[in-house]
Amino acid sequence: MNRDFKIGIKSTDEFFAEAQEMAKNTDRGVTPEKPVERLYFNDIRTLLQYLTPKRFELLDALHKAGALSINALAKQLQRHYKNVYDDVKILETIGLIEKNTGGLFLVPWDEIETTIRLAA
């Protein structure tokens, strides 16, 4: 795997400033040592709507198990299929879960780093 994912809270202006800095580095021929995929939310409330404790539990279980069907994951977590299905689809939409060619879901990240800055 060897892929990392960074989650944080940034304003639209901060997001575009970071993207601009990365583009400048690319133009200068500077590439990151290891690519890191990113997901930013505008505020903590939105982040917590997507990243609930149950979804973190699901991510952890799926990462440990490897690729699973939603049915197998629901059984492992001892949760209702529909609830697991909904959570998997949300996590897939925001990029934290991927589907392999066999139709099974997996967490391809070795590390998910979350940064939450407190207001000054």
What residue ranges belong to the model's regions?
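A short, conserved structural fragment
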Residues: 93-102
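Short, hydrophobic-biased segments on the C-terminal half of alpha helices
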Residues: 88-89
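Short, locally clustered residues in the helix-turn-helix/winged-helix DNA-binding domain
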Residues: 60-64
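Short alpha-helical segments that sit at the start of domains
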Residues: 29-57
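Short, cationic-aromatic polyanion-contact patches
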Residues: 45-52, 69, 101-120
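A short acidic, leucine-rich amphipathic alpha-helix
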Residues: 72-77
